[in-house]
Amino acid sequence: MHFLQNAVVAATMGAALAAAAPLEKRSCTFTSASAAKSGKSSCSTITLDNIAVPAGETLDLTGLKKGTTVIFEGETTFGYKEWKGPLISMSGTDITVKQASGAKINCDGARWWDGKGSNGGKTKPKFFQAHKLDQSSITGLKVYNTPVQGFSILADHLTITDVTIDNSAGTSKGHNTDAFDIGQSTYITIDGATVYNQDDCLAINSGEHITFTNGYCDGGHGLSIGSIGGRSDNTVNDVTISNSKVLNSQNGVRIKTIYGKTGTVENVKFEDITLSDISKYGIVVEQDYENGSPTGTPTNGVKVEDITFKKVTGSVKSSGTDIYILCGSGSCSNWTWSGVDVTGGKKSSKCKNVPSGASCSD
C-alpha cells in the first residue's frame, strides 16, 4: 500500500515537473504584437517574426523572464497614429537582444515628420524605451527612420553594441531624432554605434559610469552632456566619450547646463574625437540655457569639474565657431586640455570664465 501511495506521489510530482519544464526553456516565435505580449512570460527565447505593430500600440516586451533572449527577424513595422509611444518597450534582467541576419526595424518616420519634432505639429511616438533593462545587452539592431527620439535609456549595466540608427531620409523634415538619451542610469556602454540623424547622437542628462566609444555620428547635433539642471537627478559623473567621428553636424562635443539651476558634471572625458564639417560649434560648453535656448548670461549653479578634452580635432565650417566656452563664475574647474586642434571656423570673442589650461583660441 505504501509502495502504491509513493508511486502515485512520484508520478504526480513527475507529471508536474514535466509540465513545468517547458516553461523554463521554451522557445517562442511570435508573428503579432498581441501574441508577444500575452505569451512572453513563458518564453526563454523570443523570436519576433515580421511583426506589424498596430497603430497606437506598443510592442510590449516589459517584465521579461530573467535570462530571456529576444531576436528580431524579418522586418518589424508600425502602424500610423499620432501618439507619444513608445513603439517598443522592454524591461528585465540579463536580457539579450539581437537580430537575425538581414532583419531591420522600420519605423517609417516620414509619416510623422513635419519639421517640428517634439515641439509641435503632429504628436510623434518615441522609438525604444529601455527602462529597467538591467544587466542586459542590445546587439546589431538596424533601425530606420524613427519619428522622434530613438533609445530612451534608464537602466543599470546595459551594453549596446553595433547598433545602426539611420534617419538619413529625415534631413529636410526630421527633427528631435536623438539617437541615445540617457538618464538616471549607471554602467551604460555604447560601442560601435552608427547614427544618421537630426539631433543629438548622444545626450546624457544624468547618470554615472557611462562609456560611448567607436561611434559614427552624421548629420545631427553631436555628442552632448545635458542639458543639466532642473530635473530630479542633475548629476553626471564618470563619462568617457572616445574614438568617435562627428560629421556634418551642428556641434561636435558639447556640455550645456540650465540657467539658474544646480547640479554637477564631473569626471567627463572627450578623447580622440574627429570632427568634420561642423556648422555651429566644434567644442562648446554653455551654462546659459533657459527654455531650451542660450541667453548669453551664464550662471554657476552647475559645477563642471574634472573635464578632459584630449585629441579633439577636425574642421568647422567658416560660418561656425571653433570653440565656445561660457562658464559661470568659478563653476568650471580642473580641466585637462591637450592635443585639441579644431580649425576652419571663427574664434569666439564671447567666451567667459574659461578655466585654466583651456582655450577658446586653439
Swiss-Prot record:
Cell compartment(s), UniProt: Secreted
Listed transmembrane segments: none
PbH1 repeat locations: 155-184, 185-206, 207-227, 236-257, 265-287, 299-344
Keyword terms: Cell wall biogenesis/degradation, Disulfide bond, Glycoprotein, Glycosidase, Hydrolase, Repeat, Secreted, Signal, Zymogen
Disulfide links within the chain: C28-C43, C201-C217, C327-C332, C351-C360
Propeptide span(s): 21-25
Enzyme Commission code: 3.2.1.15
Any one cellular-component term (Gene Ontology): extracellular region
Annotated catalytic residues: D199, H221
Enzyme class: hydrolase
Signal peptide: 1-20
Substrates-to-products reaction catalysed: (1,4-alpha-D-galacturonosyl)n+m + H2O = (1,4-alpha-D-galacturonosyl)n + (1,4-alpha-D-galacturonosyl)m
Entry's Gene Ontology BP terms: cell wall organization; pectin catabolic process
Alphabetical list of InterPro entries matching this protein: Glyco_hydro_28, Glycosyl_hydrlase_28, PbH1, Pectin_lyas_fold, Pectin_lyase_fold/virulence
GO molecular function terms attached to this record: polygalacturonase activity
Record's keyword annotation contains Disulfide bond: yes
pH profile of the protein: Optimum pH is 5.0.
Residues of this chain annotated as glycosylated in UniProt: N334
Pfam families in alphabetical order: Glyco_hydro_28 (PF00295)
Family per record: Belongs to the glycosyl hydrolase 28 family.
Alphabetized PANTHER family for the sequence: ENDOPOLYGALACTURONASE B, POLYGALACTURONASE
Function: Involved in maceration and soft-rotting of plant tissue. Hydrolyzes the 1,4-alpha glycosidic bonds of de-esterified pectate in the smooth region of the plant cell wall.
Protein name, entry field: Endopolygalacturonase B
Gene: pgaB
